């Protein structure tokens, strides 16, 4: 059976285009070596030769089961030392690495396609990243996804189930493992081809694409967890910290010029309002239109000296200034002016403080896209101040929402996609049963945190049944995410909040000469 599976995996490689026909024997021999075999079983060869060749669809569908059989064999024969998710993932990545073209071949193919069409190049690379099992299609399919209708548009909700939970043995082994500084982080270019270890994923099946952004060396890859279509990561070739500055806007727009079918954005560069990785400069993008991108302007505004740039406040729960123009240099200049003003801006009546005790609080989450002949920049104003009442952040999901979402509101959430914790899948199922049976949620250790929320929304519905309960729970989770975004907005969607927002716009318009002097002196 093992020999038959080695042949089937080789066929998978050829059907998907990972393995050229000329490399068939070579690939079989590499897999024999990996599984400590000296030859193919003759019966397996006969069975393989008499098979009906698999289609691409069959190849994709069969990969998980095929790898599981190979992993089981490896464990039963002492090749794989632990039979847990972490160790199985390390070994099946090694298996898939045997099928992969070398980095230079992938880059050459990408670049030759790019010369004709940028989309054709990313289509090839995205398919490769899935066929290689770097993006595990069969795990991504397990994610729960739905949309929630709000006055701000359709918000995307996802419960991420594709990121495996670490098992206790792996956690214990990771604590005992020698601490390594190689690669420095999960984004570094040194991950390409790396074998991994118990506390760092294997990446033998990973290929990255070099891109030049603003005359510096960057790389393109996809997220292995694809929260949305073609979820890509664009990262600096150097392990250098995140920083939002004038050059950031130039880099984002330069990337969009090269890949006009993609949007790209950056997480903010401060804790609480930033992403999970602040140590390595990177952007996230993809081929997807979020609710925020679809949102219209609530109010058009004019920036003095930039009358050629269309600008406005976006109808969105967070505080977003949208700039649009065909000339990217004009966008960069105005975005920089807004950023510099915001960095130093304090409005005590609106509870916005540029800094307290020397700690800066104001930053921006920027997003770039091409729309028709114009380039767009969405500048989301952020502030990470904390108080005794809100120790995790004033402009962060407040405590009453933590039963659904308490993690940072990063770039993806800002644009309208909730990435919710895996625990919610089971909790939703338990909530359904408890609500239908009228059970006491407060006496349930797992569900008690949801009790206030459920008691608040139940009266809205005349009748809750087996048929409509799932839809109701999903809808209400979506409305919680709406509240999360409203909490994260520095200017609230009220008359008072909008007046405060316009005070900031007025301040930007008064800053022209000051900023010219500041840059000249720097």
Outline where the language-model segments fall.
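Active-site microenvironments that recognize anionic phosphate/pyrophosphate groups
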Residues: 1-234, 238-241, 317, 331-335, ...
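Helical scaffold of the NTase/Pol beta-like nucleotidyltransferase catalytic core
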Residues: 205-208, 237-264
């Amino acid at each position: 059976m093992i020999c038959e599976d080695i042949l089937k995996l080789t066929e998978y490689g050829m059907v998907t285009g990972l393995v050229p026909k000329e490399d068939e024997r070579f690939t079989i021999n590499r897999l024999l070596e990996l599984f400590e075999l000296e030859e193919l079983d003759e019966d397996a060869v006969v069975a393989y030769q008499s098979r009906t060749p698999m289609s691409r669809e069959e190849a994709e569908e069969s990969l998980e089961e095929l790898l599981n059989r190979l992993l089981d064999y490896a464990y039963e024969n002492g090749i794989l030392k632990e039979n847990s998710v972490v160790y199985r993932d390390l070994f099946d990545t090694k298996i898939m690495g045997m099928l992969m073209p070398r980095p230079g071949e992938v880059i050459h193919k990408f670049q030759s396609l790019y010369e004709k069409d940028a989309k054709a190049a990313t289509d090839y690379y995205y398919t490769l990243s899935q066929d290689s099992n770097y993006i595990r299609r069969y795990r991504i399919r397990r994610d729960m996804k739905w949309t929630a209708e709000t006055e701000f548009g359709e918000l995307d909700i996802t419960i991420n189930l594709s990121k495996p939970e670490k098992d206790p043995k792996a956690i214990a082994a990771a604590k005992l493992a020698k601490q390594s500084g190689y690669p420095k982080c999960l984004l570094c270019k040194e991950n390409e081809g790396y074998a991994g270890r118990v506390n760092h994923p294997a990446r033998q099946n990973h290929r990255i694409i070099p891109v030049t952004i603003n005359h510096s060396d960057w790389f393109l890859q996809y997220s292995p967890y694809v929260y949305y279509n073609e979820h890509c990561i664009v990262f600096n070739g150097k392990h250098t910290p995140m920083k939002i500055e004038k050059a950031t806007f130039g880099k984002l727009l330069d990337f969009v010029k090269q890949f006009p079918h993609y949007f790209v954005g950056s997480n903010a560069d401060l804790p609480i309002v930033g992403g999970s990785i602040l140590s390595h400069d990177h952007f996230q993008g993809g081929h997807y239109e979020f609710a925020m991108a679809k949102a219209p302007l609530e109010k058009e505004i004019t920036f003095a000296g930039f009358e050629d740039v269309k600008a406005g406040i976006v109808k969105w729960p967070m505080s977003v200034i949208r700039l649009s123009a065909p000339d990217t240099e004009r966008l960069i200049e105005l975005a920089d002016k807004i950023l510099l003003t915001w960095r130093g801006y304090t409005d005590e009546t609106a509870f916005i403080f540029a800094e307290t005790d020397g700690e800066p609080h104001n930053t921006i989450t920027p997003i770039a896209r091409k729309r028709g002949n114009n380039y767009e920049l969405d500048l989301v104003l952020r502030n990470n101040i904390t108080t005794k009442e809100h120790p995790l952040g004033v402009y962060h999901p407040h405590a009453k929402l933590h039963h659904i979402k308490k993690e940072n509101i990063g770039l993806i959430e800002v644009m309208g996609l909730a990435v919710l914790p895996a625990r919610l899948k089971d909790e939703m199922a338990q909530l359904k049963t408890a609500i239908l049976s009228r059970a006491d949620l407060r006496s349930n250790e797992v569900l008690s945190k949801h009790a206030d929320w459920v008691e608040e929304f139940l009266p809205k519905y005349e009748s809750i049944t087996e048929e409509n309960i799932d839809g109701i729970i999903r809808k209400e989770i979506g409305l919680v995410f709406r509240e999360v975004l409203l909490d994260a907005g520095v200017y609230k969607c009220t008359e008072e909040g909008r007046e405060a927002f316009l005070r900031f716009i007025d301040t930007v318009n008064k800053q022209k000469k000051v900023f010219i002097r500041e840059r000249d002196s720097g």
